[in-house]
Regions:
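A detector of single, family-specific signature residues
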Residues: 1-431
């Protein structure tokens, strides 16, 4: 693979500008509601105004167009809470709009600081957001320019796939619980994960032990062989299990209840399998439309599902330098001090999906990278828990990847190990 090209995923830069010194034509705080949206506005001449907008895209776009005409397309800063994606989508269609996305906890704490009674109203909430822009803009970071549509599409596919996998896992656990209650021998009859097609076929044909024991051994044996089983000794062992098994549940009403439940859950699992397969095809296609897809695909342990997630994570981060990535993705620790007490903990408000992506990939990289395995084992030997060790490993990986993207070179395991030895890193002693 040749050296990676300079594209969005390889362009190592701070994706935000210095908006602290920007002269805005107006500052606007908007509180998103179900039926209407409240706003507070301060123009550059010092005047304030407030109002509400009916919940409709037409009303919102009409209002934004009036702001564009009123301020002559000069920059206008908007403060909105992070939980209002439709509002964000509308505002970002105007090139003069600069969006500061406020975490709900931030606005809540500022509101309660001045209203300890707990009173809450949309107009005051919009004013709180405006106050943050007026008094604390130096501590806020504007949203970076939107990433390319194909990256957003890929990110959506990755997230949808993960949701389906999580849902399928939940259904598999429900199936396992039901089988334990009336047909525990099933777990000895197939070693596959419960979402595998052979499990659905098996339980659709023999949903309980009674129907299975009534079947001829030759037919059961043919079922195994026709579904890819070639180990004759294993098949004979399972036939013997069937022959000697005793049903734990013989009440027809209870068996009917359990088999019906398992049937319906397996139907959902089969549908999820088909949907995941479709998403895998779409994900592969869109992933390969990105110029640097091979760079991510060849990272140790980054398979067909994790490599696209890593690409999206880096492309959608506000900054692609190592320190910015480590903070944004939540691998950089936070130190708190109160009096004589000092403690360190992980960052709580990192983007969950991206944080999860880095943790999962770090775990897989241990199986495919010599130095990553050594790093993980040394961390465990120092008493670190699994997730703390993986988070530290992800922290390390971000430095490596950021450097590769900065220099526009591919990751090379052997070259990196040589670098560790040259620097006399503690990792190099056992490599």
């Amino acid at each position: 693979m040749n050296a990676i090209h300079n594209s969005q995923s390889g362009n190592l830069r701070d994706k935000t500008l210095d908006h602290d010194s920007t002269q805005y034509a107006a500052l606007v705080g908007i509180d998103w509601g179900d039926k209407e949206h409240a706003f507070h506005l301060k123009s550059d001449d010092g005047t304030f105004e407030s109002g509400t907008l009916r919940h409709s895209s037409e009303t919102l776009f009409q209002w934004l167009s009036k702001l564009e005409e009123r301020f002559g397309s000069r920059p206008v800063a908007f403060a909105i809470e992070a939980q209002s994606p439709p509002l964000l989508a509308a505002i970002r269609q105007f090139s003069w709009a600069v969006v500061f996305q406020i975490h709900p906890i931030t606005s809540k704490r500022l509101r309660t600081a001045f209203t300890p009674s707990g009173a809450k109203d949309d107009l005051p909430d919009a004013k709180v957001l405006l106050d943050l822009l007026i008094s604390h803009r130096d501590k806020l970071r504007p949203l970076p320019e939107p990433v390319s549509p194909k990256t957003r599409i890929l990110d959506g596919i990755c997230r949808e796939r993960r949701e389906l996998v999580d849902q399928r896992t939940k259904w598999c656990l429900q199936t396992r619980a039901a089988l334990k209650a009336y047909f525990p021998q099933a777990f000895e009859l197939f070693s596959d994960e419960l979402f595998r097609p052979i499990v659905s076929k098996f339980l659709a044909r023999w949903p309980d032990l009674i129907s299975l024991k009534a079947e001829k051994s030759s037919i059961i044996k043919r079922f195994y062989t026709s579904n890819g089983y070639r180990n004759v000794a294993l098949i004979d062992q399972r036939l013997e299990i069937i022959k000697t098994s005793i049903a734990i549940e013989i009440d027809p009403s209870r068996i009917s209840e359990y088999t019906r439940k398992v049937k319906h859950i397996l139907e959902r699992i089969e549908l999820a399998n088909r949907q995941i397969k479709e998403l895998d095809l779409q994900m592969s296609t869109v992933f390969k439309e990105h110029e640097n897809w091979q760079f991510f695909r060849e990272l140790p342990g980054a398979g067909p599902s994790l490599a696209p997630r890593l690409l999206c994570a880096i492309n959608m981060a506000p900054e692609n330098n190592a320190q910015g990535m480590q903070k944004y993705f939540g691998t950089a620790p936070v130190k708190e001090k109160s009096g004589s007490r000092v403690w360190t903990h992980r960052r709580w408000n990192a983007p969950r999906f991206f944080h999860q992506t880095w943790g999962e990939w770090a775990g897989l990289s241990v199986q495919h990278s010599r130095w990553a395995k050594e790093f993980y084992e040394q961390a465990k030997a120092r008493g670190k828990g699994r997730y703390t060790a993986l988070r530290a490993l992800a922290f390390k990986w971000m430095r490596v990847i950021a450097r590769c993207l900065e220099t526009k070179t591919d990751y090379n395991e052997e070259l990196y190990i040589q670098s560790l030895k040259k620097r006399r890193s503690p990792l190099a002693q056992h490599l």
